[in-house]
Every structure is written in structure tokens, then in C-alpha cells.
Swiss-Prot record:
This is Uncharacterized protein AF_0258. The chain crosses the membrane at residues 9-31, 36-58, 71-90. GO terms for cellular component: plasma membrane. It is found in: Cell membrane. It is a multi-pass membrane protein. Its main location: membrane. Keywords: Cell membrane, Membrane, Transmembrane, Transmembrane helix.
Amino acid sequence: MSIEVRKSIFPSLPIIVFIVFVEVPVLSVIYPLIEVLTIYPLLISLIFSLAVFAYKFQKSEKNLKRLARQIMALFVIFWLLSQITMVVAVESEYHGIVSFRRDIYNAQLSCKG
């Protein structure tokens, strides 16, 4: 792999680290259908991603503007994915309640008849 390819991949590395170590655990904790992770992996991944950002911030003081844009992009991506996840969670909960009420209604109709 050439040096130019590595330089083009490196600015996206914090975004990949943030998505893998922060957004995926947060969304899997928030989303009720895939409650696999507990709070401890969430905290570990949050600490790890903050350590990566602190290292990158300390290493590149001259690129502070680019780093600030990357951090803002990460928060925007996190916010959008959390909003999408919450909409999906609310919709699945709504459909679960509707099917439960429909079953109760059908059971009451069958008992009367």
C-alpha cells in the first residue's frame, strides 16, 4: 500500500473508530430488539474512542480545524443514526401493540359468538 493511500485512509480512521466503538454499542443498547450489550462495553468503547481522539488532538495541533470538523461530523452521524434507530424502535413497538390489541379484540369476539 502506498503512502498516498494511507494518508487518504487516515482521516477517515477516527470516523471508523467512532462508529465501531461508540455508535454500534450505543445503538444496540438503545434498540430494544438487539439488547446484547450492557453498559460496561459501552463505557469501555467510549473511553477508548475518547483516548483515540485525545491522542489525535495532541498529535496534530496544526490541523485543529480539520479535527474539529471530523468531531462535528461524528456527532452529526451519531445523532442521525440514533434518530433513525429510535424511529425504528417506536415503529416496532407500535406494531407490537397493534397486533396485541388485535389479538385481544379477536379473542373477545370469539368468546361472544
